[in-house]
Structure formats: structure tokens, C-alpha cells
Amino acid sequence: MKEKIKHIKFDNKTNPKSYFEVVQLEELLNRKLDHDICKNHIVKFYIIIFITEGNGYHTIDFVDYKYQKGSVLLVRKDQIQKFSKSATAKGYLLIFTEEFIVSHINKLEALKSFQLFNELISFPKIELQVKELEFSDFYSLMEQIVSEYKLKDEYSISITRSALHILITKLFRIKFNNGQLPNKKKYLTEFLLLQDMVEKNCFANKKVMYYAQNMGCSTKTLNNIVQAIINKPAKNFIDEIAITQIKRLLIGTNESVKEIAYTSGFDDPANFFKYFKKFVGSSPEAFRRSHQ
């Protein structure tokens, strides 16, 4: 498969073994890199973007999210993103890998932390109340992380990990209080297992029955699991993941639409065209052109 856009791996040249980096947004927008951050690129790490001043927008998986002072944007590993130039925007990016989180906390807590970045469970943007303690409290914690990152003594990494875990937990609280997290936790573990299964197999099989059998449950139970967490039928959930992955192939590779149709599990490109247009509202070719 020919890659069309950059796959950006974690690369902290000053401290490569830390698996963590802090970057000022305004500095990043003017930094000379080997890729254009204002064009689509795939990230192989996690990002928390905190806006302290100004406004603009950031694109995650082909959706533009407007931001302003107090906005927090969450990008998970393997998503496609691009920045937009802004003359007023200031803020921080916390960039880190799975290793940075997993090496500090137990597996259950680590899995919970990564749920924050799961766009299928919750919206990838949080608005902090600028005039309330919520903003100043978050800002203070961010400044502590920045300070420890700059200090770079033998204790800095441990303190930074702990502070990041607190920051992620605070974001969970804010999302919960804003009604941005699922109320029912009964099926959350099963949902995450299903999501992983669908993301790995949706091109080979898009049928609810297939996933129900592999989960060891009935199609009714599978629908209950998905409805409880994201309030959608299981088939819609499967198609949503498949469409996102098809979009990534259209933008991220040089494969022809016909080749992508076959890769996506369609024997007939005409059926692929109908499937894509049904969910996106445009043809695969038109979608590709609009994001070049």
C-alpha cells in the first residue's frame, strides 16, 4: 500500500526516552519541520491541546473543531489531524505515547485513561469555564507539567507522569459533569472489546451476527451493549468505524478508488460507491478531492 500522507512518530530529540513532550502551540505553528502540519498527517501518539488565548480551529479525522480560550482538544493515536494557522492562538500541546502512561499506572487505570481519547465514546473537545475555578485549576496543573518538563532532573519524569494522570482524571470529571460520558458503565468493557474487534475486522465483515458470535452473545445483546454506551444500533456503529477507515485510506494512500473498494471488502466497486455515498453524502472521488 502506497502511503500518501506522513505518519508522524513520536520524536523528542532532547529526551527521546521520556516518551513525553511539551510544545507551545504558537511555537509549533512557526516551527520548520519535515512535514506541513497544516496538511493531513497521521499521528502515532496521543495529544492534549490546551488553548490559553485566541481562537482558531483544528481538524481531527476530517472534522473541523473551533477552539477558543479554555478549549481542550484530544487526539488519539492513529487519527488523522491537521492544524490551522492562527495569528491569535496560544496554548500547549502535551504529546505522549502509550508507554508513558502504562509505565506509571496499572493496566485498568491505563485503559481508563485512553478512554478519554476515544471519539466514539465522547466528543473530542472540552470547553473549560474560563471565569470559573475549572479553568484556573487546569491552567495551574498545566503550568506545573511545563515547569517539570523544563527542569529535567531525576524526579521530573515521575512527577510529570503523576501530574498528567491527575490532569486526565480531571478531564474525565469535567466530561462526566457535562454529560459527555456514558452513564451506564455496565457494558463498557464489552463495548471496548467490540470496538477493538470491529476496528480490526470491519473490512472483512460488516455483519452484526459475526461480531455477536465472536463476542459469545446474541445479536440482541450486542445491540444492547452498543445502545447503552453510544445510543446507536450495532450496525450503525460497525458502519461508522468502516467509513472512518475508508476515509483514512482515501486520504492517506495513493490507492485507486477501485483498489480501496476491494481492500474494504467489496467485490463490486459500484456497491462500494453506494455504501460510501449513503453515509458521507458524496462519492469517494469527491471526498478525496475535497481533502487534498
Language model: regions and residue ranges:
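Basic, amphipathic alpha-helical hairpins
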Residues: V146-D153, K170-G179, L193-K207, I225-I230, ...
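A hydrophobic/aromatic-rich effector-binding and dimerization subdomain
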Residues: I5-K13, K17, S86-S147
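Terminal helix-turn-helix DNA-binding modules in bacterial transcription factors
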Residues: A228-F273, A286-Q292
